[in-house]
Structures are given as C-alpha cells and as structure tokens.
Amino acid sequence: MGSSEQELVAIARDLGCGSYFLGTFDKRFPGFMAPNKLACAIVNTAGRETGGVHWLALAWNPKSHTCYLFDPFGFSDERLKQIYQFEYEGLLKRSALASTPDHCITLVKSTQTVQGPFSAACGLFCCMFLHAFIHWPSNPMEQNPTMDLLTGVPNSMLQSPQVEPTLRRNQERLYRFLTQHSPYFRRHRERIEKATAFDQMKNAQVLFHNKIFY
C-alpha cells in the first residue's frame, strides 16, 4: 500500500526536480548539508526497517533562508510528534543550515489538509509539492499553478464527511497532474492508483491511522 521509494524517485525525476532532489529518506534524514544550494527531499516519519508510515516533503531555499515542510495532512507540530513520534527540530539542528551567517532559519509548514484520512497517496502529494518548489521556490505552498490545483481544508475537519468530496477531488486532480507530467506514472498508472487509492487504508489495521482517529 502507498508509494515505494523507487516510484517516488522516478516521479520526482519526471517532474524536473533533477539534481535538487536529494532522494527519499526515513526519519533519520541528515538534513540539508549544503546551505547555499536549493534542495528538496521526501522523508518518511518512520524508520526504513518498519516499511514506512507517512511521507512528508522538505525543501530548502537558500536565497530566503527558508525551510519548507509539506505534510499532506497539515498536522501541527504536536500532532506529528504524537501520531508519528516525528520531530523535525532535531533534523534542522543537525543539518548544515545552522551554518548560515546569521544562524537564522525561517520554517514554513503546511497547515491545511489536502489528503483524505484513508488515502495512501501521501508520497504522490509530496511529489506534487516538490514540482511547485522547483518551479516557484519563493512560494511553493500556494499561489502557484501547481498547488492551486488543490483545495486545502482545516486539519480539524480531516474526518468530517463535509469535506470528503473536496479531498476526493484533490486526489483526482493529483492523478490528472501526474498523468500529464510523469511518463513513469502514465506507464504504471493502474498499479499506482490502486496502491494509493482514496479509501486504501479504510479497512487496513494500520497503527498510525488508529492513532489519528483514536
């Protein structure tokens, strides 16, 4: 279920991330080691030995000394720690970003939900965000042609039936976007869509979803 590392790397390459894309990592991501270079990565909240749990995207814009953290669920810092035991403060501290002249980093984090609670498409949404970052590094979260295809809802409404049509439409637009921009996705579309379906996690006994709801 969900996206494999190989799939995400192939799709990110198709989307033009090129040498700026550092790859996929587990929760031990060492951080951005070149403070003067535009860079991005897809990071899992769990260790690789677990098979993975949830994908996030991280990006660094050296021009503005800004680090972007994109979570398709838009969880708060506290919820990320509670649900996934994932903390990004340590990640930033152990990276080379602290070596910037003024030791000052701006963190911009997504706060709205674009992915349905039972969807397994978190990695694909991360790829979409990285496309926005590479093309519009000063405003990758919003107000660009890529991310404006999606409609965010308050994270507090993640489980609300009221927003299900919006989140389902987001996933349909995600698939359409990847079909247009990624030859790899087009070749493997049926398999990828099945593995990342909007209701993929609904009947699965997956720990992190239990934590989300309970």
UniProtKB/Swiss-Prot annotation:
Entry EC no(s): 3.4.22.39
Coiled coil: none
Organism domain of life: Viruses
Binding partners and assembly: Interacts with protease cofactor pVI-C; this interaction is necessary for protease activation.
Annotated keywords: Autocatalytic cleavage, Disulfide bond, DNA-binding, Host nucleus, Hydrolase, Late protein, Protease, Thiol protease, Virion
Catalytic activities: Cleaves proteins of the adenovirus and its host cell at two consensus sites: -Yaa-Xaa-Gly-Gly-|-Xaa- and -Yaa-Xaa-Gly-Xaa-|-Gly- (in which Yaa is Met, Ile or Leu, and Xaa is any amino acid)
One GO BP: proteolysis
Top enzyme category: hydrolase
Function: Cleaves viral precursor proteins (pTP, pIIIa, pVI, pVII, pVIII, and pX) inside newly assembled particles giving rise to mature virions. Protease complexed to its cofactor slides along the viral DNA to specifically locate and cleave the viral precursors. Mature virions have a weakened organization compared to the unmature virions, thereby facilitating subsequent uncoating. Without maturation, the particle lacks infectivity and is unable to uncoat. Late in adenovirus infection, in the cytoplasm, may participate in the cytoskeleton destruction. Cleaves host cell cytoskeletal keratins K7 and K18.
Name the record gives this protein: Protease
Lineage: Viruses, Varidnaviria, Bamfordvirae, Preplasmiviricota, Tectiliviricetes
Marked site: Cleavage: G51, G52
InterPro entries, per the entry: Papain-like_cys_pep_sf, Peptidase_C5
Gene Ontology annotations for the cellular component aspect, listed alphabetically: host cell nucleus; virion component
Subcellular location as annotated: Virion; Host nucleus
